[in-house]
Amino acid sequence: MSKYDSKYLEDKLKKELQTEYVSVTDESDGCGGKFSAIIVTPAFNGKTLLQKHRLVNSTLAEELKEIHAFSQKSYTPEEWEKVKAQ
Amino acid sequence: MNRICQSLLRQSYQNHRGLVAGASASASTPSVLSRFFAADAATGEAVDKATLDKLVRTNKVVVFMKGNPQAPRCGFSNAVVQIMRMHGVQYDAHDVLQNESLRQGVKDYTDWPTIPQVFIDGEFVGGCDILLQMHQSGDLIEELKKVGIVSELLKAEQAKPEDEKAK
């Protein structure tokens, strides 16, 4: 359906947001309409949850027009350490 | 049949609009857990900022979703409904599938690309991911507390014996 795959989205997020860790999973069985992402970057430092998500949404504004469902978990490196520890 | 439903819903919606003007009337209907307005469609007007400014304040919590709380028509909307149910939150829900101008209107209003969208005390809080994360971190309980809603989860927590609270 959409022309995007997880690799493309990971590369773009890595480049635009200088991510320390990024993982995008295609949940659409290959049609490219549904993704979930874990995004870790210092660019999120000092931002509220809403601001983090807005940053990702604006980075992928063009792609999200075609991607039907996009779910994100966005953490600062510090938050990510805590999440991993759990 | 559909038309009959619509006209019924339209009526209830208009009643609701009256409520907003009257303000205090909502307190007299505590038996309704969540109010749902499907007939936004009936207005036919473009949904502008001034209208949304009012809509997001008709209750402490207002949700724009696909489908209605009894029958969500999207997994993300359903997740929000389930979170609200767990916390025992009474909220107003609007079905954007009934009204394309509301769907676009609310997206423009928040500059947020997806549905569902949740408002607490008139402030845009986020979509499904954010609600889920707030639910998991406990922030949702705090946010609800700020507007005078005591989460059912908090009540359950406080009712527990001390040794179980660590969980």
What are these regions (language model features)?
Chain A
Residues T25, I38-V40, K73-Y75:
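Solvent-exposed beta-strand sheet faces enriched in polar/charged residues
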